[in-house]
Amino acid sequence: GDASEYAWAPEGKSLVFSVRIAGKTEAWSTNFDLYHVTVDGKAAPRNLTAGNKAWDTSPVFSPDGKTLFYRAMKRPGFEADRFAIMAMELASGKAREVSARLDNAAESLAISGDGKTLFTTTQDTGEMPLFAIDITNGEATLLARDGSVREFAVAGDQVLFTRDRLDSPAQLFLTDADGRSERQVSVNNRDAIAKTAWGAFEQFQFIGWNNESVHGYVVKPANYVEGRKYPIAFLIHGGPQGSFGNGWSYRWNPQTYAGQGFAVIMIDFHGSTGYGQAFTDSISGHWGDRPLEDLQKGYAHALEKYRFLDSSRACALGASYGGYMVNWIAGNWPEPWKCLVNHDGVFDTRMMGYATEELWFTEWENGGTPFDVPQNYEKFNPVNHVAKWSVPMLVVQGELDYRIPPEQGIATFTALQRKDIESQLLLFPDENHWVLKPQNSIQWHDTVNHWLKRWTSGEQPQ
């Protein structure tokens, strides 16, 4: 946890903190509760949210100390449930929802000095805007968007926040609490940004699974020239309840591919966050059909809309669930791809159900345990389609990954080698589910970029 997991009461003699006390059930429980404790240690912590068996977190006191605001999920065992903002009267223990008008999960929480307004961020249609919520009636007012607001602090009638975009790392901005008079107060890395060639980006929309609207982004190569065609990097996000949108990342950043001369396509398929909870829920039990249909339709739409995309030179890349999808399309949609990149992806969903440290995740997504409903785990299991694999694949795996353990990546590479498919394995002994160390990140990008260029530029295998 971090500082958002606890809050001091205004009187300074007690605090509330979020903790999961699950014993041996911790691996399949998402039941975090809020406990109130005095600092003198004379009384045991009191569970304020024992009635909710799902996730309770992010406590914030009202200025008078009489009300506790916090974020809460409703469905036990579902880590991607919607976080609602709740208000609890501490004297009575009664709680009500404040954010009913927001259909997306609240990401963070702060309160105004007068106790009348809550501030929160939430993913929304490929971005992460900042909202002000009237505590009395729940009315939400948009304060800032045009990118992703990650952090914010309230001071008097102003809000200081960071915002990043697909073409800028985080910068500091200041706005009035009503969203007016926004101004930028920092230009971090000014010289580096000025010297960097950026790929222009655009959001697009198409009709996907169930005749519903689906969104995506295209990023032009940094060296874009009108009339030319460019190879494609088709990025598939993880989660699967996640999003690739208008925000900056020091891991999967589309500008790194645009800078190498690739055009980038990213689809927020069914299951993505920021499009309402029903949209997010739709992927559970459907890992291999609904999102695949969106990816196929989104790819076709992008090819038709953006004539600079060269479909004869395309590679698909993904991590975590994105890596699962790379394995899945290797056996179910191989035709468009010159190469694939699978980072920490699931190879065998049934084995994943026994090996991951997040049992709640696989059990929710598959509707039960692998011994109770094995057929659910096999329905969209990439291992059952290896016989159809043929596309060259780079496999990346962290040996400290307990989310999707190393045997998944090693098994993927073994299958590729056994089938005599051109493949490479990049194994990081000191990384977990993410590549976090700077030198390892450089090696990751160098290896991935070389792999993409090898298969999209006509170079002979080495």
What are these regions (language model features)?
Residues 220, 228-238:
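Short beta-strand element of the alpha/beta-hydrolase
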Residues 1-23, 121, 140-225, 252, ...:
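Non-catalytic accessory segments flanking enzyme active sites
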Residues 15, 65-69, 117-118, 159:
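Hydrophobic beta-strand positions that form the internal "hydrophobic ladder"
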Residues 229, 240-254, 269, 407-408:
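The serine-hydrolase catalytic nucleophile loop
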Residues 38-42, 89-93, 134-138, 176-180:
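Short loop/turn segments that connect beta-strands within beta-propeller blades
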Residues 253, 258-259, 266-462:
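Active-site-proximal cap/loop segments of hydrolase catalytic domains
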Residues 1-3, 18-33, 47-60, 71-86, ...:
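A flexible loop/linker signature enriched in serine peptidases of the S9 family
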